[in-house]
Amino acid sequence: MTISPPERGEKAKGAAPTPYDQPVDRDHAPIDYEKLNKPGFWSSKLSKGPKTTTWIWNLHADAHDFDTHLGDLEETSRKIFSAHFGHLAVVFIWMSAAFFHGARFSNYTGWLADPTNVKPGAQVVWPVVGQEILNADLGGNYQGLQITSGIFQMWRAWGITSEVQLMALAIGGVIMAALMLHGGIYHYHKAAPKLEWFRKIEPMLQHHQIALIGLGSIAWAGHLIHIGAPVAALLDAIDAGNPLVVDGVSIASAADVTNLAPRLCDPAVASQIFPSLAGRTVENFFTLNWWAFTDILTNKGGLNPVTGSLWMTDISHHHLAFGVFAIFGGHMWRNNVHGVGHSMKEIMDVHKGDPILFPAPKGHQGIFEFLSNSWHGQLSINLAMVGSASIVVAHHMYALPPYPYIAIDYPTVLGLFTHHMWIGGLFICGAAAHAGIAMIRDYDPAVHIDNVLDRILKARDAIISHLNWVCMWLGFHSFGLYIHNDVMRALGRPKDMFSDTGIQLQPFLAQWVQNLQQSAVGTGDLVGAGNLPGSVLSEVFNGNVVEVGGKVAIAPIPLGTADLMIHHVHAFTIHVTLLILLKGVLYARSSRLIPDKAQLGFRFPCDGPGRGGTCQVSSWDHVFLGLFWMYNSLSVVIFHFSWKMQSDVWGLTGGNFAQSSITINGWLRDFLWAQSSQVLTSYGQPISMYGLMFLGAHFVWAFSLMFLFSGRGYWQELFESIIWAHNKLKVAPTIQPRALSITQGRAVGVAHFLLGGIATTWAFFHARLIGLG
């Protein structure tokens, strides 16, 4: 369904606009439970009830498409805002469940006492049908499922030392969930914000940057300074075999730390751990005597050798500094209270690009209005940014491990990397989806003439054709290197292979960056690194290996020909994903094939009957295809990461990555086949559930092919034969069975393809590293 921009946000034709005196409408929509009993109440067509089975699928597809319910931007905004509170309630319930499991069903205190030998567990399988074999002996007199979420390591970093504290957090999570649910009801039914409130961009930026991000970060820094870092110092001393003495008492166990915790905010106690907490902190702060805080706000760099993680005092310093920057940044914007500061609209309207490289005479004029009226446009940008940030987090989790002992919990490291990569990929595909919707529903060509958006659309053929050329070049060359190596190895000619011992293709730029980082320490060559100790950089760069409990926490990562080859496969798959997603956005409204595509909406299977060769051209179909290539891209990434870390950092596969990963056969034989031995031989062991999951997820993946490889007509013909048989037996249903629409079939197909593929990989990775112990 297409909603033309001029009508969006209008209440009634000819109605006078209400003055913006109050930001909310009181008692906007009384709670009507009768309406909720009627499925599809928001659609005149769906509210009539089902006549065919298509009804249930349309109900799923359109339930959250608020645009199509009323076409009123204010009402849509209110629904989204209310739904945010509901989402937060779900998050708090989820967090509460994690805390509750930690409090009642975990070996958290046992893990705290011996984090290098005891494995984390927070779930116990009930022997309903004899599946108690899944409860492994994880140490600390505990049998249960080994968890790989990293929550134990995170809780230790927070300063949690007992199950009582976890139970308190669980109760707090439920209370917060109730408050959030109440907030969602209140801000839709009792005090619903007006559209003008949602459009006030500068106050929103101030609230987010100053209050949520800035003050939130500083508040967290306060917790780390007064609780997290002192508890970490006490626990680190215990783990190092040299307990600290506080008030004449040796703090020799986590229980001792728990008993001391209520007094950690007492300056007389805290100053025995960090002298700068002796009680003059406020005075030192306001007299700018900030050097007094150098023991609690540090810049040590590197990793704590006891825990193999970043120093807690470095982390508290980071959060304090980041919070201050965010507060300063938030004050940049002009608001209703005073006329000082920047206006986002004024900044964008005067901003112009390079006249030669990007000739758009009107620059960014009209973009502010577009984004302040298009929630899909805003969501697209936010999804792209958060998705990219998630991918950055994935890489920081192993390069700069933030939580104590997380770096030596290899299943958790691999699991968190994979998790954040998938989340990032899905969010970026979502960004393309909502950009396409914004172009179709919210974009008015008459408003955007000769600005940057118009300029990009005019250059779309050049952009896509160049991107296509890049994809072809990368694809043929990167894959060609592997094919060459397979042929040479098959013919017994190793010296003619691209490898570190044959024809070298060294990633000299990446090696140069590594050497630059290492050689700059103690000099003025690297900004901020002048005269700093050698530990100020991550051990990945300065050549050190950090071992904790006999396991490698972090080590230099050597780069060679194998890395250059797989890196170009990454470039290829990512660029193809970009090509598909970007084409779906740039051609969302029109193309040479279908000039009136905007009238057909976001998702449509083909341009009607009688016009062949126009299928899979909708913006939705581009997201559909992009999801497959996103999956392809990230599969290569997580496989590369898994093998590289096992081979060159963790020492699990004897350093075979450099010579085995340079052929397709090597990936199949030495990675997929060799490393699947744990999951394939898992029966009769605690990891047997991963063996079952491995098989089940393969089935889910294969199930998707039934939807992807067949057309709707095949199924409709089959259904009609089955209905005929039911009619003969007089057991025909009153709701007429219909085959899934083409688009619905594709949606079911891609959902099962991704779910099956991700769960298969999940079982493969977990069984591998948990099985190795």
UniProtKB/Swiss-Prot annotation:
PSI electron transfer chain: 5 divinyl chlorophyll a, 1 divinyl chlorophyll a', 2 phylloquinones and 3 4Fe-4S clusters. PSI core antenna: 90 divinyl chlorophyll a, 22 carotenoids, 3 phospholipids and 1 galactolipid. P700 is a divinyl chlorophyll a/divinyl chlorophyll a' dimer, A0 is one or more divinylchlorophyll a, A1 is one or both phylloquinones and FX is a shared 4Fe-4S iron-sulfur center. It comes from the Bacteria. This is Photosystem I P700 chlorophyll a apoprotein A1. It is an enzyme of class 1 (oxidoreductase). GO terms for cellular component: photosystem I; plasma membrane-derived thylakoid membrane. It is a multi-pass membrane protein. Keywords: 4Fe-4S, Chlorophyll, Chromophore, Electron transport, Iron, Iron-sulfur, Magnesium, Membrane, Metal-binding, Oxidoreductase, Photosynthesis, Photosystem I, Thylakoid, Transmembrane, Transmembrane helix, Transport. Induction: Transcription decreases upon iron starvation. HAMAP family: PSI_PsaA (MF_00458). The PsaA/B heterodimer binds the P700 divinyl chlorophyll special pair and subsequent electron acceptors. PSI consists of a core antenna complex that captures photons, and an electron transfer chain that converts photonic excitation into a charge separation. The cyanobacterial PSI reaction center is composed of one copy each of PsaA,B,C,D,E,F,I,J,K,L,M and X, and forms trimeric complexes. It is found in: Cellular thylakoid membrane. Belongs to the PsaA/PsaB family. The keyword Electron transport applies. GO terms for biological process: photosynthesis. Divinyl chlorophyll a binds at residues 706, 714. Pfam families: PsaA_PsaB. The keyword Translocase does not apply. Its EC number is 1.97.1.12. Residues 1-27 are annotated as: Disordered. It catalyses: reduced [plastocyanin] + hnu + oxidized [2Fe-2S]-[ferredoxin] = oxidized [plastocyanin] + reduced [2Fe-2S]-[ferredoxin]. GO terms for molecular function: 4 iron, 4 sulfur cluster binding; chlorophyll binding; electron transfer activity; magnesium ion binding; oxidoreductase activity.
